[in-house]
Amino acid sequence: MLDALAALLKALLYVGILSCAGAVFAQATLRPPFDSSHILSQLIRRGCVLTICAALASAGCLFIRLGAEFDIATLSAVFLSNTGAAMCLQIAGAGLLLFGASDASTRATQLSNALLVTASFAFNGHAAADGLTAGIVAFLHVSLAAWWFSSLWVLRDACARAGSTAVAATGWPS
């Protein structure tokens, strides 16, 4: 039961990370239409909240799976391990994105905060166990996947706003 809960929380964490970090990457690189700024800010805010909640819940679930003892070994396994480092990066990056300024003059700061969130994949999971190179590849892979994920939301929003004639001109079925 706890394994299923941990998998669900991990999936929610991934959705949150793809949303919040990807929206920042898309906003910085795509020059989206002015109408799409609302969807990007929603993706950032909701993704940040989901990332923070899922990261904390995942840490709590891991604590319970390890026996829920408040001893040094259990707390070290949760907070002083690669899992704890990844959780700190996720919460710090998402918190800075959520509570930081979000105008055009702070774009570089937003990018660095989003990179903090995706850098957590270099410290946790199979890639971290394989070494530094695999961790960097995982970090880049997740960053690009997040950009792609949010870029599709921007494209979907732009197509919905353009109307059926503009979408029909692209050749996509409506």
Where are these regions (language model features)?
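Polytopic transmembrane helical bundles with strong interfacial aromatic enrichment
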Residues: 1-174
